[in-house]
A protein has these predicted regions:
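Glycine-rich N-terminal segment of FAD-binding domains in flavoprotein oxidoreductases
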Residues: 1-87, 91
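FAD-binding subdomain of flavoenzyme oxidoreductases
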Residues: 82, 91-133
Length: 133
């Protein structure tokens, strides 16, 4: 299942009676892996709002970190927490995404000085098991 918006994601969850295997950018697997129906967040991507003067960016969970960094670089800005790309260390492929960074709190060497990834999140919306969003 590859839902393209929150409503389709909600429907996919409601239509599944058993366990779900949530798939993101595919850079690494964390936790107990479910053998359930596969549900990908890959199509839930894109920058919804960017206000450089307010240092505010809103993006969907499947948005690649590289896309966010490119947009920020255009305004001489960056992600202060420097999300680490684990692919080389883990020998994996895939695309690091905003959802993965926030879920795993992936932060680089500046974490000690400026804070972790989640410290920069002003808000997060998500679909719960009852398919509310």
């Amino acid at each position: 299942m590859f839902p393209e918006d929150e409503a389709a994601l909600s429907d996919a969850i409601l239509d599944t009676a058993g366990p779900l295997q949530i798939l993101g950018g595919g850079t690494r697997r964390v936790g107990r892996i479910s053998e359930g129906r596969k549900l990908s967040t890959a199509q839930l991507k894109g920058i919804v709002l960017y206000e450089p003067g307010a240092l505010t960016l809103v993006a969907k969970t499947g948005t690649p970190i590289a896309e966010i960094e490119n947009v920020l670089a255009g305004e001489n800005q960056m992600l202060a927490f420097e999300p680490m790309d684990h692919r080389v260390l883990l020998g994996t492929q895939g695309t690091p995404t905003l959802g993965g960074v926030m879920a795993a709190n992936v932060s680089g060497p500046r974490r000690i000085q400026v804070g972790a990834a989640r410290d920069f999140a002003l808000g997060i919306s998500f679909v719960v098991a009852l398919a509310n969003y």
